Structures are given as structure tokens and as C-alpha cells.
């Protein structure tokens, strides 16, 4: 396919997904589809709605905004409560969808959105923390910091503090990133481990460092986008903190780029084990890299020379995994459905574990980031 054909196909693909989805039955939430349970407020839908709102801002096509509002309004009640959301669950994943409420509040001015934003912010007020001050990823994972959580919570936190709280929590957010850098970055590769257990109690945690054993691509992807999204929302008056996260972002992109597959432009599910049996070129993490770099370049956070790395990742992913079915429908393959640490399934962070999780098509954890990268491509 030519680049023009790929961009055209992606536009059709998003239209196909939203035409066949609703808040009750989002076809892109494969975990929900497989469970057969009613839909809940969740980060997966949040990724897709973020992508739809970005498409609206880029194209001006109101169908993306209308769909997003209808979807969110299914959950956000007139009094600002959020159906199925419980702040006391203390799950950072549930904060992610809150970013979209700022957009709808700005566009429509409805008080229920501001109340819902405040409700989600109340979770962070009492979210358990490590002794050094980082949010626990979830209440059910005590003393643990996961890279994923930076994307799920920090952009929302930074936007709230900047807009509504006189920047009181902005330094706190910055310090959480610095703690992650100190504990979770591998000095040899520059990559970051998926998880960190301050207590060193979990079976997956290194007894010395507290880190999990491997570099999972999507976790790195979430982390890269988190830095870009936080900087987008951060006031540059916080000069040292702003420059600190920006320098960390640039260094991370430089280090990650070294693991980009020369032939396809993609990245491997476990990043530093290319070609190992069971490993594969993975869509969601590659798309997150492309999006983080393209957006970082557009915002002036990253040097322009890096855009070529992102384009290679973007088109490489589409060439390998975006296809048209005989019935004319489109699908995006190569998406790791889920990966975590601990829990009832004894997820130990080993290579065998990361290779064992299902690989699916059309899940928003891959589709959302690819569409976000697509919006950056067409906005140039």
C-alpha cells in the first residue's frame, strides 16, 4: 500500500469501528467482549475516546465529537456521578478516561463534567502511595509502581493542578517521574522495567532493585506518551521541572530507538529480545512510540530528526498488520491483549509470561494509539 492509501484506509477504519460501537457494546474492547459482562468505566474505552476527540480537533468532523459525547454521557450522570466508577477502588487505570472530561467541559460547559472531574481528582487525594510519594498502581497491588500508571493518571493530575488547583500538585507529579527514573531505568539499555515493588515482597521483584525482570513494550509506550502529555499540560513557569521531564523524554526516545527493528520499523513485545522464539513485533507499543514522537516533535519537545523514526514505526505497523477482509471490513492485528504483574494468574514478568498473553485484532489498546499517531500524521 502507498502512504496515501494507508491514511485513507485508517480514516475508513475509525468510521467502521464507531459505526459498530456504543458505550454498552464497544467492539474495540476485546476484554469486555470476551467477558460477556456489562461495560464499565475503563481506560480502554478512554484510549479510544481520546483518539476520537483528537480526530475531531484535527479534522473538524463533528461526528467524532458527537460519538464521544454520547459515549461519555452514558456514564456521566447529570449530578456528576459516574456510573460504575468507585474512587475508593484506588485503581489508576480508572483515571485515564477523566482526561476526556476536560475536553467536553471546555466545549459544552456542562457542570456535570466539572463535577465528574472533581470526583476523579478526589481519588488521587487519598490514593495510597509509596514511602517516596508515588501513587500505588492499584490498591490491590500495594507498594507497586507500574509504568502504565504514569499514562493513566499523570496527564489528568497535571491538567487538574494547572487549571483548577493553582499548580499545587505539579511538583508532586514531577517528583513521581523522577522517582521512576531513579528506580526503574536500566542504566545499561536506558529502558525502563515494567514494574517496581518498593517493599520487594512480590515474587516478581528483584530483591535488590525491586524491579520486574523485563522491558515490556507497551509499558514503555504508555510511559513515553505520559511524558509528552504531561509536558503539554504543564506550565513552563515550572522551568526546572519542565526541562527535567523534557530531558528525560528525549533521552528515553533516543534509547528506545536503538531497539527499533531495522526492516519493519516496529518494536518487539519484549524489547531487548528480538527474534527470540515466541517474541513478536507488537502493534500497540509501536504505535505509542510513533504517537509520542510525532506529538513531541510538533510541540517542540523533541528534535525534528526524530520524526523519521516515528513515520517508519507508523507505516511499518500499518504495512504489517492493517488489512482488509473479504467483506470489506478492516482489521488491525498484532495487539497484545493484556499484560500485568502478580494477581491470581501468578504473572511473573518472565519472557514466557509476556509471550503467553493473547494476541488479538481491533483492540483499542492498539487502535487508539495508532489513530492518535494518524491524527498527528494528517495534521502535519
PLM region spans:
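Alpha-helical scaffold segments in carbohydrate-active enzymes
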Residues: 12, 16, 54, 74, ...
